[in-house]
Structures are given as structure tokens and as C-alpha cells.
Amino acid sequence: MAKAKFERTKPHCNIGTIGHVDHGKTSLTAAITKVLAETGGATFTAYDQIDKAPEEKARGITISTAHVEYETTNRHYAHVDCPGHADYVKNMITGAAQMDGGILVVSAADGPMPQTREHILLARQVGVPALVVFLNKCDMVDDPELLELVEMEVRELLSKYDFPGDDIPIIKGSALAALENSDQKLGHDAILELMKAVDAYIPQPERPIDQPFLMPVEDVFSISGRGTVVTGRVERGIVKVGEEIEIVGIRDTQKTTCTGVEMFRKLLDQGQAGDNIGCLLRGTKREDVERGQVLCKPGSVKPHTKFKAEAYILTKEEGGRHTPFFTNYRPQFYFRTTDVTGVVHLPEGTEMVMPGDNIAMEVHLIVPIAMEEKLRFAIREGGRTVGAGVVASIIE
């Protein structure tokens, strides 16, 4: 079946829902599509559909972040809904990395919870530029003073992680009320107010479209009769159908050709920075590509294993380590979409690193990763984030 061409008329923005498990992230995502569907800006997507991430299910491989698209009068949005459980933190990291802005969902009945804090920290870590808060389940709280208290708590928490807590819009409402049409003000109207805040407060991202093409590989599919499709979000630049590209990282660099680009099941003649695309690769086998590699313009990025980094090690209270670590510490380094084991070498005169420290360190990875200065990473142990860092300089 021929696919419809994807029209680019409005500016595009990637956002997503973050927050504690069961605070209503997926319900809110469904509610946004329901309310915007009234004006033709979306197709209503029910909770259980989002929960199942339908577009990936069709290919027999599931991606744990669900994508929906919708538009307001000002913008076109691609919205990711990240699962809330702590063991999905890996996807939270890739999900949050896919955001020009985030909607932090906090239950008014519970207030901020451990994952609220963790997701704000992760948003800060992966460089989400702006957050808007939806105080959900307000229909369950009768006391206006209690609502104010929760709002204050949320603002304090945001400020603690270097978001402008005093300025961030906080919209009070109920996703369920919007889905069930039970309370116009807390439901329908609050959702419209939220979208207004998202339009106004989340800055239109400047797309690094003029830089050389780079796309981190998130998933790889084999589509019968068409070949291998690699999905991910284009980090920068443009890939045109027919262009030669390189697959860099983890293994030896390979050359291939992009023979097709699709977005939301529609064909494009090119994919550009900010787009979530599937890229069809000529002559590349499913097993030749894996999550953690990047597709890029030939020669633009090299794989490296040794670099100097500036890192922040989380405190115990932030969910980090309880004990110090020493030279030859071997955690995982989470680059873009994957964990790679590496060995830490501390600078002369630094005996050990305590939770809460900032540290300049040298890292030797066991496999090469496509990297450049300013690339961010998380430091993890057994699936738990224990630090955040940035590549300061490359050694080799």
C-alpha cells in the first residue's frame, strides 16, 4: 500500500509525559488526544492503546515508549509516554532524551514521590530544556490549601534540580474527568489550558539542521520484502533518500545507503533533525545493526573508547550509591540509547569519590561508542542511575 506523504506545515516539537508510576501520565496522554480531537488536531487514542504502544506491536517487536501525534493551532507535536516503573529507567532515559519539553504529571492526592524526583533529575541530566506541570487528580482533593501545598512542594523540587521552579506553569486538572466528560473545568478546560501552556512555555526548539546528519539507533526491524529498518530520533542534520551513510560504534564502521525514510507510517523524501523516523538501509542485515550505534554522515563522527569526563555522582538521598568508589570502578556508561561497561581512572591525588561529589575522571570503555565533546551520559549500576556526566575531551 502506498503511504501518504507527510505534510510539514506547522513547526514540530517533541514532548513527553514524565512522573511517578500511577500518577496518570498515560491517562493524560489519552486525554490530550481526546480533547484535541474535537477540533481535528488529533485522533483520539485510548489509554489501553497507548499502554500497548500500538505502532510497534504491528511488527511483532515492542518499543516501551508509546508515540502519539497531535497538533494545536501553533504546532505539531510528537508525544512520547514513558512507562513509570523504576525498572523502565533505561527507557525513561531514551524517552526523556527525545524531548524538547516535558509534561511532569504529579498526582494532587499524593504529591511528589520518589520517581517524580528521579524523572526531574533525569530530565535535567539528559537536557530537557523546559517542563510544564500537570497537577492531576485534583477532583480527589477537596481542600484548596492542600493543593497549594502540593504546588509549593513541586516548585521547590524543580528548583532543586535547576529548573526555574517559580516560573514553571502548573495546571490543575483531572485527566480522568476529561476522558469521562465528568467535570468540564477540571477535565476539558484544564487540558486546553495545559496545551496553551505547552505552546507558550516550551520554547520552539532550534533544530541543529545544518550540522552533519546523526541518528542514534533505538530499534532495528526486518520488514519482509523491504529490508532492514532502523528507528530513532534524528539528532541533527538531514538524511535524504539515496544518500550514503555510516553505521558507527560498538563494531567496525560500516557504510550503507538510506533507501527510504518514514515517519508516523508516512513516507518522506528526507528525515531531519527532531524527526522520529524509520530509515530503510540497503544491503544491511538485521544482525549488522544494534541499539547503541548511530547512523551518520560518512566521516563526521568517530568511535572512541577513552575520554575525559566531568561527572556528578548522586547522593544516597537522590537514589545513588551509599558508599564511595575508587580508581578501577567499573560501572555502565549510558550513551544515547545503550549501556557500555567502562573503567574509571581517578586523577592524581584523588583517593576516592563520595556520593554527592563532582569529579573529573578518565573513562576507558570496553567497546567504542560514537562520541564527541559535550555528549552526555548517565553512570549506572545494575539498572540504577548513580551519576551523570559529560564528555569533556576525547583521548582516543
Curated annotation (Swiss-Prot):
Residues 10-206 form the tr-type G domain. One of its GO terms (molecular function) is GTPase activity. Residues 174-176 are annotated as: G5. Residues 81-84 are annotated as: G3. It catalyses: GTP + H2O = GDP + phosphate + H(+). Signal peptide: none annotated. Residues 136-139 are annotated as: G4. GTP binds at residues 19-26, 81-85, 136-139. Residues 60-64 are annotated as: G2. The keyword Transferase does not apply. Disulfide bonds: none annotated. One of its GO terms (cellular component) is cytosol. Its main location: cytoplasm. Residues 19-26 are annotated as: G1. Mg(2+) binds at T26. This is Elongation factor Tu. It is found in: Cytoplasm. CDD domains: EF_Tu, EFTU_II, EFTU_III. PANTHER family: ELONGATION FACTOR TU, MITOCHONDRIAL, ELONGATION FACTOR TU-RELATED. It comes from the Bacteria. Its EC number is 3.6.5.3.
